[in-house]
């Protein structure tokens, strides 16, 4: 908490100018911020920011505890408000090792922040700056549960209104996290993997079929949201393109069926002509549905 308040003081106006006056120079003020960042990289789990972020108010690079790992991400906070705000964790899809995961969904988190959400673009375990290894949804959902707990402690966050949005592998993890945390009140999953073994059999991606699933996912039964649908209590929106061959559309169709059998609330949006990713009007249609869904379940009465 102290770290957050200090960083807010250093990165806010007119507070920033006051710091400069006290320290004697802009460079000295930046040095203080860099020292805070270095402390964070040494293991601090409080809110931190770097010098580049000073030019982008409301954007913070963060480090937080996961389930036995340290997670990194980018947090966006809307302009100051007197009311508590809902928060959304944004999860990326699979990426080449070494690619910072949070950067892939930073733009999505920023857009959510502009709509009044505290938004955390999270690097899942296996992608920097988070530690650990990609595990195809084994412990990654526990990390998301820990991230939800962390968000709930931040000033200005409504601890009773936390959601998750994920893409592809991130969609799989978002769904699984709904069975690991009671804090999660809404889930939006873009073209998620929901049945790992069926995915292996039907994907057009030979790397997934011959390497990723056998080496990373294993049997994949408990990594498959379709098998634990009754444990997911949050409302779910599934979004999938009807021409997706990497994660075939049937993955969302089967998830919809499983959630309905479990008497859970689920909505499914099929994007005509959509592949494993959307463009132009497809993207607008999907985004409109996602934000509408979050607004209904996380901003009731507004």
Predicted regions and their residues:
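Short glycine-enriched nucleophile-adjacent loop
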Residues: 171-182
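C-terminal catalytic histidine-bearing segment of alpha/beta-hydrolase fold enzymes
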Residues: 253, 261-302
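N-terminal cap/lid segment of alpha/beta-hydrolase-fold proteins
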Residues: 47-82
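Alpha/beta-hydrolase active-site loop
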Residues: 135-155
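Short beta-strand/loop motif that positions the catalytic acidic residue
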Residues: 232, 238-240, 244
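Alpha/beta-hydrolase fold nucleophile elbow
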Residues: 157-168
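Short substrate-entry loop that stabilizes the transition state in hydrolases
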Residues: 82-85, 93-131
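Mobile cap/lid helix-loop segments that gate and shape the active-site cleft of serine hydrolases
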Residues: 100, 192-228, 234
